[in-house]
């Protein structure tokens, strides 16, 4: 496991009580949503267009996220195809009260650049 986050900080928030599952930990769907939002920001910035999520792969939940944890999503571009981008995402937390930093989740998201009608378009590279 890496000792520090890889990629660009794309989201930072605090895990709140309303986002818990029946066991009192933060619901995995909420964490996945943060990952999707953060990687979507990076994808749109890279493509310079609207993007849509087409796949999530290799999701691993390594540690629970707890209420009060500061949650940070880091993303990086792994691959750019003609219309798609593959973006690995890592979620790190700073534990509430102790300050311990841990990688808690990781996965890979794939986005496709689309036009205003939702049709795939080439990813614009260097403003082209």
Model-flagged regions — what are they?
Residues 56-64:
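Short, charge-patterned binding micro-sites
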Residues 25, 59, 107-109:
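Short non-domain terminal segments
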Residues 3-11, 66-67, 78-128:
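HotDog/MaoC-like acyl-thioester-processing domains
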Residues 2-55, 112-128:
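Hot-dog-fold acyl-thioester-processing enzymes
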């Amino acid at each position: 496991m890496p000792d520090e986050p890889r990629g660009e900080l794309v989201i930072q928030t605090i895990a709140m009580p309303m986002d818990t599952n029946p066991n009192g930990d933060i619901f995995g769907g909420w964490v996945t949503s943060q990952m999707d939002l953060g990687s979507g920001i990076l994808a749109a910035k890279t493509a310079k267009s609207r993007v849509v999520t087409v796949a999530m792969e290799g999701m691993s939940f390594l540690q629970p996220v707890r209420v009060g944890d500061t949650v940070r999503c880091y993303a990086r571009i792994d691959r750019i195809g003609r219309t798609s981008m593959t973006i690995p995402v890592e979620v790190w937390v700073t534990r509430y009260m102790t300050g311990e930093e841990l990688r808690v989740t990781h996965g890979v998201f794939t986005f496709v650049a689309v036009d205003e009608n939702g049709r795939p378009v080439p990813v614009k590279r260097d403003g082209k």
